[in-house]
């Protein structure tokens, strides 16, 4: 490409970006004469859920004493106020002037806030200058290119071990499919990107940023989960937020380029998610249902269940959280570790609308246990697939810290050899007692065969012909 051609392409790209930002500015200018909570949340019923939603988000943040914070897309400052009450300093930014003026009015009593009117994409801050980058509904208003650029900027702005909080409407608006509640103008195009939740997880995990000192950094994504208020008030599991920490990159890591990440989020990850949606969204039942049924018959109603489904051996080897909730009138938390399967679980929840069932994503069971320890949670029953084969010994020993006294542990394990004595010894070394050991190999193979027959889109999938054992443990 010649210099003139390259210059022409760059000029066209800049022009396209400027048009896009103008469209978004026009989109929000329609609400600028009403700088209130309804406008911030584009929801006629926002006042009913605002305080609860805000409490959910703030409860997920780390302690901010002596910390510096930037609140990007702050609007009228519904989060800025609380952030500034505990943080050392807050920069509150938005690209609608009337919103920032309202923000300044409501926070005039606080002297540790700076305000800036401007686009999030063009925000200028010093490197290593803040401890928390806080956003709430931002990247859905950015193009794929702008989203990647913004995540690079977050990495640059954050100090070592700084935190970024992101929250987005995934796959659909915050109002779900309700046109009555939405303030979106149906007569005009809505420029919002309702991306898959998995795309954000993958982007945060993939980025490797090299700073001016040639040091390489990555994000440790601590968790992803739905915002509880939107489940309770709107039956919407697709209001998702994430917390990620800036940490040194692993040894041997290489930096990721802007173009590489744009291609991944625009095409590769999108296509991969759509392929898994086609296979899993219409799942009628889970093949493990019958296998687990005998071990679960003695469990009391109104229990709290902690599920772990790594799906390492097969995407179809997981636990039917909705069946457990229905059978035992139980509250169920299911930890997924594959972003694409997590997204399909949220879809199923949105369709079935059983508020007793919640799904979270963590990189490992270790992170999930840490998440619940921080919340002082206790569960009555732990049900898993591949628990002993995918979890490190230290985490297995730590798991009882989030389980109640007398809790039951049930796991379906693929094994090379059915050896009860060997399994019993290992379990004892981990601090557990083996109460029941059942060879369910034939049952698992038959269940998989029937499952694939019953799902037309899965007819070509392979049965996992390993040995399988069902274990019941106590601690």
Swiss-Prot record:
<keyword id="KW-0949">S-adenosyl-L-methionine</keyword>
<keyword id="KW-0444">Lipid biosynthesis</keyword>
<comment type="function">
    <text>Catalyzes the first step in the synthesis of phosphocholine by converting phosphoethanolamine into phospho-monomethylethanolamine (N-methylethanolamine phosphate). Phosphocholine is a precursor for phosphatidylcholine, a major component in membranes and a precursor itself in the production of glycoconjugates secreted by parasitic nematodes to avoid host immune responses.</text>
</comment>
<dbReference type="GO" id="GO:0006656">
    <property type="term" value="P:phosphatidylcholine biosynthetic process"/>
</dbReference>
<protein>
    <recommendedName>
        <fullName>Phosphoethanolamine N-methyltransferase 1</fullName>
        <ecNumber>2.1.1.103</ecNumber>
    </recommendedName>
</protein>
<dbReference type="GO" id="GO:0048609">
    <property type="term" value="P:multicellular organismal reproductive process"/>
</dbReference>
<dbReference type="GO" id="GO:0002119">
    <property type="term" value="P:nematode larval development"/>
</dbReference>
<dbReference type="GO" id="GO:0000234">
    <property type="term" value="F:phosphoethanolamine N-methyltransferase activity"/>
</dbReference>
<dbReference type="Pfam" id="PF13649">
    <property type="entry name" value="Methyltransf_25"/>
</dbReference>
<comment type="similarity">
    <text>Belongs to the class I-like SAM-binding methyltransferase superfamily.</text>
</comment>
<dbReference type="InterPro" id="IPR041698">
    <property type="entry name" value="Methyltransf_25"/>
</dbReference>
<keyword id="KW-0808">Transferase</keyword>
<dbReference type="GO" id="GO:0005829">
    <property type="term" value="C:cytosol"/>
</dbReference>
<comment type="pathway">
    <text>Phospholipid metabolism; phosphatidylcholine biosynthesis; phosphocholine from phosphoethanolamine.</text>
</comment>
<keyword id="KW-1208">Phospholipid metabolism</keyword>
<dbReference type="GO" id="GO:0008170">
    <property type="term" value="F:N-methyltransferase activity"/>
</dbReference>
<keyword id="KW-0594">Phospholipid biosynthesis</keyword>
<keyword id="KW-0443">Lipid metabolism</keyword>
<dbReference type="InterPro" id="IPR029063">
    <property type="entry name" value="SAM-dependent_MTases_sf"/>
</dbReference>
<dbReference type="GO" id="GO:0070832">
    <property type="term" value="P:phosphatidylcholine biosynthesis from phosphoryl-ethanolamine via N-dimethylethanolamine phosphate and CDP-choline"/>
</dbReference>
């Amino acid at each position: 490409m010649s210099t003139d051609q390259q210059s022409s392409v760059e000029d066209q790209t800049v022009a396209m970006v400027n048009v896009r930002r103008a469209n978004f500015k026009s989109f929000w200018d329609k609400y600028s004469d009403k700088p209130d909570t309804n406008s911030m949340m584009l929801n006629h019923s926002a006042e009913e859920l605002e305080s609860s939603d805000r409490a959910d988000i703030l409860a997920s943040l780390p302690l901010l004493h002596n910390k510096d914070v930037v609140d990007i897309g702050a609007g009228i400052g519904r989060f800025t106020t609380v952030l500034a009450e505990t943080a050392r300093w807050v920069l509150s930014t938005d690209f609608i002037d009337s919103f920032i003026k309202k923000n300044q009015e409501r926070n005039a009593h606080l002297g540790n806030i700076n305000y800036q009117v401007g686009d999030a994409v063009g925000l200028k801050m010093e490197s290593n200058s803040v401890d928390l980058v806080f956003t709430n509904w931002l990247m859905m208003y950015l193009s794929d290119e702008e989203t990647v650029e913004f995540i690079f900027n977050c990495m640059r702005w954050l100090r070592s071990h700084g935190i970024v909080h992101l929250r987005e409407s995934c796959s659909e608006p915050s109002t779900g499919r309700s046109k009555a509640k939405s303030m979106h103008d149906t007569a005009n195009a809505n420029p919002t990107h309702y991306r898959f939740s998995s795309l954000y997880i993958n982007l945060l995990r993939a980025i490797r940023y090299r700073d001016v000192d040639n040091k390489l950094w990555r994000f440790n994504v601590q968790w992803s989960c739905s915002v509880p208020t939107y489940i309770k008030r709107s039956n919407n599991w697709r209001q998702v937020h994430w917390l990620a920490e800036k940490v040194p990159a692993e040894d041997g890591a290489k930096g990721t380029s802007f173009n590489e990440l744009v291609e991944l989020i625009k095409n590769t990850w999108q296509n991969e998610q759509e392929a898994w949606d086609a296979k899993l969204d219409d799942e009628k039942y889970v093949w493990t249902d019958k296998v687990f049924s005998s071990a679960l018959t003695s469990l009391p109603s109104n229990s709290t269940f902690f599920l772990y489904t790594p799906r390492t051996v097969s995407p179809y080897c997981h636990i039917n959280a909705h069946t457990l909730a229905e059978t035992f009138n139980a509250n169920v938390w299911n930890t997924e570790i594959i972003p694409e399967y997590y997204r399909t679980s949220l879809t199923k929840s949105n369709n079935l609308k059983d508020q007793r069932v919640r799904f979270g994503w963590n990189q490992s069971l270790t992170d999930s246990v840490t998440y619940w320890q921080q919340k002082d949670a206790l569960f009555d029953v732990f049900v898993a697939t591949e628990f002993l084969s995918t979890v490190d010994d230290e985490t297995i020993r730590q798991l009882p810290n989030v389980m109640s006294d007398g809790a039951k542990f049930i796991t379906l394990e693929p094994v090379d050899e059915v050896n009860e004595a060997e399994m019993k010894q290992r379990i004892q070394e981990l601090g557990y007692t083996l109460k029941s050991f059942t060879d369910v190999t034939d049952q698992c193979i038959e269940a998989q065969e029937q499952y694939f027959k019953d799902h037309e889109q899965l007819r070509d999938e392979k049965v996992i012909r390993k040995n399988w054992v069902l274990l019941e443990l106590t601690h």
